[in-house]
Amino acid sequence: MRKLSFDLGTKTCGFAISDILEISANALETIRFVENDFNAVIVKVKEIIKMYQNSIDAFVLGYPLRSNGSKSERTMMVDNFAILLANEFPGINIYLVDEYGSTIKAQRILKDAKLSNKKTKSKKDTVSAVIILNDFLQYGGQKYEL
């Protein structure tokens, strides 16, 4: 089965998906949406599930904890989105992965690839989703329970 990961922001969401053997993470895309209107993300998730013929058995959400491990406003946003996902897709497990530093790693990877600033900005969330999913595939994550 496959895992679908998210790097969720207030106006963008980057997606990555695992291979069927759950060995590697592959970038999908980043979508833009109206600030804090996650219905567009749900619609995109439905498209991805259909595209991958219902082979996705888990969602992996980047969980933006502060460096001291405490929750922030963005963490609460992800908590609310996890509830939305759980209600919309009750048969799919949800895991939370500490995403601390994933954006910095993504920016470093994209800078090393010598992409333009415009390309870097458009790819950052997708690369972050890949990093989050790779972390999950290597180390696991915290299972989300309603």
Curated annotation (Swiss-Prot):
EC number: 3.1.-.-
Protein family per UniProt: Belongs to the YqgF nuclease family.
Family matches, as SMART domains: YqgFc
Organism: Mycoplasmopsis agalactiae (strain NCTC 10123 / CIP 59.7 / PG2) (Mycoplasma agalactiae)
Pfam families (UniProt xref): RuvX
One cellular-component annotation, GO: cytosol
Enzyme class name: hydrolase
GO biological process, one term: rRNA 5'-end processing
Keywords in alphabetical order: Cytoplasm, Hydrolase, Nuclease, Ribosome biogenesis
Highest taxon of the lineage: Bacteria
InterPro entries to which the protein is assigned, alphabetical: RNaseH-like_sf, YqgF, YqgF/RNaseH-like_dom, YqgF/RNaseH-like_dom_sf
The protein, known as: Putative pre-16S rRNA nuclease
Record function comment: Could be a nuclease involved in processing of the 5'-end of pre-16S rRNA.
Main localization category: cytoplasm
